[in-house]
Amino acid sequence: MTAPGPLNSAAGSLYVVATPIGNLDDISARALKILREVALIAAEDTRHSARLMQHFGIATPLAACHEHNERDEGSRFITRLLAGDNVALISDAGTPLISDPGYHLVRQARAAGINVVPVPGACALIAALSAAGLPSDRFIFEGFLPAKSAGRKARLESVKEEPRTLIFYEAPHRILECLQDMEAVFGGERQALLAREITKTFETLKGLPLAELRAFVESDSNQQRGECVVLVAGWSAPQSEDAVSSEAMRVLNLLLEEMPLKRAAALAAQITGERKNVLYQVALEQQKGE
């Protein structure tokens, strides 16, 4: 991490401005004011952002700041800032730097003693988490997983026993493969949620155990379109047999003699009132120990 330089009072400010992820009504009045008043807007895609600016009647000049030029072109923006100009940084949608460009520019600005000002707003991962019904007091954001299955599984294995809620971004053309790998690594019973096209017309938030969520996406090609956020419940230590009543264990063991583990756990839960996922974990650990 680059240590921030002494604040340069003669320099302008770099405003890190969140923009809508779908619904244009989500932009804040403060964001619009800043975008109108700054001397320059550093945008991930100037053509995309030009349409947004046109919609709101903003005539501020745009300059490209994306992953391919950010390291080299950052000095251009720093020069303007040091000359006293205010600059806004935006991405195509949501909050800059969150799986989007901007990190190198912000780092350079702070190193040069330039005031960096966050202008909060839309963020897909926070929006999804707020509506997921999964623990939100502690969570980790893993961004986009590797494109190939081997790399993806390796990353998933590294967080398999992470107790905090897991949040991932995924591209629509890889969402099914992603869920298949999650099911293979985390197990089909792990609770998860797919948040797709947040704030847009076809917004979908579907919460199911991973096996059922994978089947849901597999059966409906419409669920393989649009921007995706996947949330997965954190790992919890397997329950011991002591945590399950002796009657529930008796029923479970009888059913395991006649049917597969998943079905036995589900039926035993219906009969005894115990939680299905607890019975499933107990049976799984029991089989591993045999």
Region roles according to the model:
Residues M1-H66:
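Glycine-rich, flexible N-terminal cofactor/catalytic loop recognition
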Residues A11, N86, T165, P172-E290:
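A contiguous loop/helix-start segment that scaffolds small-molecule binding in enzyme catalytic cores
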Residues S13-V17, A83-S91, F139, R164-F168, ...:
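Generic beta-sheet signal
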Residues I34-I41, G113-V117, T165-L166:
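Short active-site oxyanion
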Residues A43, P118-G121, F168, L194:
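General beta-strand structural signal in soluble alpha/beta enzymes
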Residues A64-R71, L145-K148:
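Conserved helicase motor
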Residues G74-C123, A127:
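Glycine/small-residue-rich loop that forms an oxyanion/phosphate-binding "nest" at active or ligand-binding sites
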Residues H104-E162:
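Class I SAM-dependent methyltransferase SAM-binding "motif I" and its flanking Rossmann-like core
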